[in-house]
Amino acid sequence: MTMAVLKRLARAGVVLASAAVLASCQLATHPITTNGYGPSDGIRVVVADGINVENLLVVTEAEGETGYVIGSIVNNTGTDATVLLDIGESGSPSPFEVPARGNINLTESDMTVESVDAAPGATIPTTIQGPDGFNEVRATPVLDGTLPEYAEFLETATAP
């Protein structure tokens, strides 16, 4: 073989080796599209396998005012479940009995926070308790009526 042919073979070998190395990166990388997430303004919390708190947030007009809780608790299991939410620093958790393969719309439950300890745009602590000893504190967003969907909610909630 001539020197030119050997150089071409060496270059081809480098290209093939580089392609193999780059392709192997995909094997070690977890595709982000397989991660569950809540495409919303609120938070999503996996309480247990099949039990989630979805889109949890508090809407208020201002710090110190009443806050209205938005979100839902979803139970995709075959058994009823109890989930407790303590939003803010109230110290009195609200229990929710979520039926098997059912959900609870927190907006319809008329859950409120008497006096929100944070301004819109900040977060307040929420303690979430559930089956199997689940007990976590999460930062829950506080929003105001800037977005039309929340302005409508505040108008409805404060109407006489």
Question: Language-model features: where?
Answer:
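Short acidic, flexible loop segments centered on an aromatic residue
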Residues: G78-S92
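Extracytoplasmic/periplasmic copper-protein system
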Residues: I32-V46, V142-P160
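Bacterial signal peptide processing site
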Residues: Q26-T29
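Asparagine-centered strand-capping/turn motif at beta-strand->loop junctions
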Residues: G71-T77
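Extracytosolic low-complexity repeat regions of secreted or lipid-anchored proteins
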Residues: N105-P148
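C-terminal motif of bacterial Sec signal peptides marking the signal peptidase cleavage site
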Residues: A20-S24
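N-terminal edge beta-strand
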Residues: V46-T60
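Intrinsically disordered, low-complexity Pro/Gly/Ser/Thr-rich segments with frequent PxxP/GP/PP motifs
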Residues: G88-V116
